[in-house]
């Protein structure tokens, strides 16, 4: 089955196989994010054990001795990333100044042009009758 589309990224007819292939090609950032998070696990466990409070270490030791590994995992997850606070001299003034000057930032900007070509209206040269399932942003 083919589908007619007047998009700038898919001129002419496009098969479902081509659309599926393009969607699979967009998985690579997600896969990279998942792998990066998985690779953090050993270091996170080491940090939790090496830099833990004595009470957390006692809880891990007790629950591991009685064989309750679910509670060991719960203790590790509950106290992951718990660190002491750091007070920076002048930090509040710096944050206030940064938020005040942030009001004058231009922010995100996209030039949008409405173009009439041969009686057909386009936004940035992408046809308005394009099938939205192709995720062109329009």
Curated annotation (Swiss-Prot):
Keywords assigned by UniProt, alphabetized: Clathrin-mediated endocytosis of virus by host, Fusion of virus membrane with host endosomal membrane, Fusion of virus membrane with host membrane, Glycoprotein, Host endoplasmic reticulum, Host lipid droplet, Host membrane, Host-virus interaction, Membrane, Transmembrane, Transmembrane helix, Viral attachment to host cell, Viral envelope protein, Viral penetration into host cytoplasm, Virion, Virus endocytosis by host, Virus entry into host cell
UniProt GO BP: clathrin-dependent endocytosis of virus by host cell; fusion of virus membrane with host endosome membrane; virion attachment to host cell
Residues at the site labelled Cleavage: 84-85
Residues the record marks as carrying a glycan: 6, 118, 124, 131
Keyword field contains Translocase: no
Pfam families listed in its UniProt record: HCV_env (PF01539), HCV_NS1 (PF01560)
Superkingdom of origin: Viruses
GO cellular component: host cell endoplasmic reticulum membrane; host cell lipid droplet; membrane; viral envelope; virion membrane
Family annotation (InterPro entries): HCV_Env, HCV_NS1
TM stretches of this protein: 60-80
Residue segments, region HVR1: 85-111
Lumenal side: 1-59, 81-138
Family assignment from sequence similarity: Belongs to the hepacivirus polyprotein family.
Other noteworthy facts: Viral particle assembly takes place at the surface of ER-derived membranes in close proximity to lipid droplets. NS2 associates with E1/E2 glycoproteins, NS3 and NS5A, which interacts with the viral RNA and core protein to promote genome encapsidation. The nucleocapsid buds at the ER membrane where E1/E2 glycoproteins are anchored and afterward associate with nascent lipid droplet to acquire APOE and APOC. Secretion of viral particles is probably regulated by viroporin p7.
Entry protein name: Genome polyprotein
Protein's organism: Hepatitis C virus (isolate EC10) (HCV)
């Amino acid at each position: 089955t083919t589908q007619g589309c007047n998009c700038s990224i898919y001129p002419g007819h496009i098969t479902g196989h081509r659309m599926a292939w393009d969607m699979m090609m967009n998985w690579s950032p997600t896969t990279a994010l998942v792998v990066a998070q998985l690779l953090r696990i050993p270091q996170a466990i080491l940090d939790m054990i090496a830099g833990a409070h004595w009470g957390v270490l006692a809880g891990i030791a007790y629950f591991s001795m009685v064989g309750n590994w679910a509670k060991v995992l719960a203790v590790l997850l509950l106290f992951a990333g718990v660190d002491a606070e750091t007070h920076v001299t002048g930090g509040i003034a710096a944050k206030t100044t940064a938020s005040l000057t942030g009001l004058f930032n231009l922010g995100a900007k996209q030039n949008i042009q409405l173009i009439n070509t041969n009686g057909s209206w386009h936004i940035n040269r992408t046809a308005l009758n394009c099938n939205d399932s192709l995720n062109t942003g329009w």
